[in-house]
């Protein structure tokens, strides 16, 4: 359940109290190029339509998200950042927002509401250290374990403390303590478990970067105090590498392995592994990827990443936001790149099956077309077509989106 804003306030007060102490006692480092203070303004209008054969009714939502705030660089190295956001329904409301009670319609998880988005105090006055306290986005690596779910109108944030250390050029270490997850369904959702999770989580992520790529090792220890049986620890390693064959051609690969086990009061069955292999080739701005991702499962428990930016994995139709107990194998092929007049395309094909038992979980085709224009504007057309076999029901989704970012 959501905690009060007391954590954010305590962290901000503590940071403001420590600021003059740090400025007085620390030797003055060479000042890095400072970002500018200024307003934050974003607006995104979206039409989303869902045809899910599990429902007699199709869903349609026309929503507008406005995010407004300010970044204040109040002394070299110190930043205060705060944004609030409002989400409004511009259409008929014929969809299940998760908060409006329209359960006869498919879910489009953009409930109307107004809330604080981010509110944090940051320090980066030393090129080797960075700290941040308060409500903030958390995006680790490719967002497979922790992300901001930026696709939804209300992004996911965390009440957290972050410390980053770069002891030498190729090395970086980041630690985060997470106190609360503020979910995409809104802080005032009538279901408190959709609004937020109280956490006692420790995240450690270390990287070694070279011209040819990067190696990352991580340990994520998450005690979900609202759903204690789901608590897990995940230990893993991720490799990304690339090699230029010529000025036009580049080959690359991403590979990852993680082991998940129960943590704190987590259930004994929370035991599974994760594997990813994703080779790719790039030519003059166009990229082709062929991937194989396995979220292990044994019929009782499937490898879980509940705080990930899940929409960008396993198909845009969002049929696998929760990993089945039998796990999931996703073999996919995709291409993306520029076309005429500034437009960019994306095409993806997925074939899904159970990790335990091998049942066919269907196929999915995803396509997108988008472009930016007039410096601050972008438009996006997007489509997902999931064809079911032994899991879920056939589902088609369409999005039309216009966005402004100052």
Label each residue range with its predicted role:
Residues 44-48, 120, 175, 202, ...:
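Aromatic/pi-system hotspot detector in well-structured domains
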